[in-house]
């Protein structure tokens, strides 16, 4: 039985094979650096080439998507699907439409998805997919034609018991509808082949809210562990999409004052905080008008900071909900200097490794994305369960299940992240070890394949 000699040897081996994939290597380094002490104490997990198998996707494929724009011109985009690990259930993970999409980013997201899905305790493997197509500025007809062209190839590789995609950045309700509709036409099946669907064709209540709500439920549990709560806390949120919107909504309901939101162009600062009226306006600008946060700032006469991120604002709690690596070391240092108490990730790996290390060293409570933002995929799992039973659960039922799952994730993080001599729970270690153990045990039980 082969056994990995050391962490450095393992990371070097991965880098030699995938050295051109920095985002993926960052994710691998983050996970295995945090769980290595556990692996040294439990050598069975370093045998049977388990670690080498875990960092290699079961399959990954790239394909061309040719479609026609409104001017009759043929456009060509590149699309991918990374089916990373199915040890505990069908592949599950979103589809992202953004010009930055490449294999490295999707491998990093798919790798993270393995552990995130395992943490939910639901039977879902890890996957991720997407395209460098940018839906911004495209007509509905163009988006539909692109989605149908993409699904004409992807449908061969997905299915209710094989791989169930969902939305992600650039893939909202409109795109999911077009993708799921064409998948149904091609496969002649109405099973749950996509999650995040509209309520009129198999979707689940609370699914749009799930990631943002789940983030707040997890952060609330982190605070409760310290005898604290959101009441009266000043909160900074980055992003202004689905996750950010519903995180703001839930934080307001718990008595917090949320003072920022952002997009790729800059951020808005409101010292008085969001109100129900202001949040409704943000929903309208982003979801209906597909506008920018600058439009929101102008509507309410708020400060807008072009080209900047909201981490310079003095707050108690910071919730990065935009994109990967948006919170860098300098941002973390500024947050620490300003007295931040808690950082929880609503986006996938939005905090760099260096920033994470600085926050942990300063005893800031830190909730990693694979735990803190697992509410979205957890509710996708609940959508799959409802579809298989041909049932609709009420919003209260789904929300209660989501809340329970997030509390269970927190409990598992506490179980594996309580380290002798450390005052705070190390949620990075806890989340990574808890997710790893579930997947690793399943892989060992199923033999080498």
UniProtKB/Swiss-Prot annotation:
<comment type="subunit">
    <text>Homohexamer.</text>
</comment>
<dbReference type="InterPro" id="IPR033524">
    <property type="entry name" value="Glu/Leu/Phe/Val_DH_AS"/>
</dbReference>
<dbReference type="InterPro" id="IPR033922">
    <property type="entry name" value="NAD_bind_Glu_DH"/>
</dbReference>
<feature type="binding site">
    <location>
        <position position="380"/>
    </location>
    <ligand>
        <name>substrate</name>
    </ligand>
</feature>
<dbReference type="InterPro" id="IPR006097">
    <property type="entry name" value="Glu/Leu/Phe/Val/Trp_DH_dimer"/>
</dbReference>
<dbReference type="InterPro" id="IPR050724">
    <property type="entry name" value="Glu_Leu_Phe_Val_DH"/>
</dbReference>
<dbReference type="GO" id="GO:0004354">
    <property type="term" value="F:glutamate dehydrogenase (NADP+) activity"/>
</dbReference>
<dbReference type="Pfam" id="PF00208">
    <property type="entry name" value="ELFV_dehydrog"/>
</dbReference>
<feature type="binding site">
    <location>
        <position position="242"/>
    </location>
    <ligand>
        <name>NADP(+)</name>
    </ligand>
</feature>
<dbReference type="InterPro" id="IPR006096">
    <property type="entry name" value="Glu/Leu/Phe/Val/Trp_DH_C"/>
</dbReference>
<keyword id="KW-0560">Oxidoreductase</keyword>
<feature type="active site" description="Proton donor">
    <location>
        <position position="128"/>
    </location>
</feature>
<feature type="site" description="Important for catalysis">
    <location>
        <position position="168"/>
    </location>
</feature>
<comment type="similarity">
    <text>Belongs to the Glu/Leu/Phe/Val dehydrogenases family.</text>
</comment>
<dbReference type="GO" id="GO:0006537">
    <property type="term" value="P:glutamate biosynthetic process"/>
</dbReference>
<keyword id="KW-0521">NADP</keyword>
<dbReference type="InterPro" id="IPR036291">
    <property type="entry name" value="NAD(P)-bd_dom_sf"/>
</dbReference>
<dbReference type="Pfam" id="PF02812">
    <property type="entry name" value="ELFV_dehydrog_N"/>
</dbReference>
<dbReference type="InterPro" id="IPR046346">
    <property type="entry name" value="Aminoacid_DH-like_N_sf"/>
</dbReference>
<dbReference type="GO" id="GO:0005737">
    <property type="term" value="C:cytoplasm"/>
</dbReference>
<dbReference type="InterPro" id="IPR014362">
    <property type="entry name" value="Glu_DH"/>
</dbReference>
<feature type="binding site">
    <location>
        <position position="167"/>
    </location>
    <ligand>
        <name>substrate</name>
    </ligand>
</feature>
<dbReference type="GO" id="GO:0005829">
    <property type="term" value="C:cytosol"/>
</dbReference>
<feature type="binding site">
    <location>
        <position position="92"/>
    </location>
    <ligand>
        <name>substrate</name>
    </ligand>
</feature>
<feature type="binding site">
    <location>
        <position position="211"/>
    </location>
    <ligand>
        <name>NADP(+)</name>
    </ligand>
</feature>
<feature type="binding site">
    <location>
        <position position="116"/>
    </location>
    <ligand>
        <name>substrate</name>
    </ligand>
</feature>
<dbReference type="InterPro" id="IPR006095">
    <property type="entry name" value="Glu/Leu/Phe/Val/Trp_DH"/>
</dbReference>
<feature type="binding site">
    <location>
        <position position="113"/>
    </location>
    <ligand>
        <name>substrate</name>
    </ligand>
</feature>
<protein>
    <recommendedName>
        <fullName>NADP-specific glutamate dehydrogenase</fullName>
        <ecNumber>1.4.1.4</ecNumber>
    </recommendedName>
</protein>
<comment type="function">
    <text>Catalyzes the reversible oxidative deamination of glutamate to alpha-ketoglutarate and ammonia.</text>
</comment>
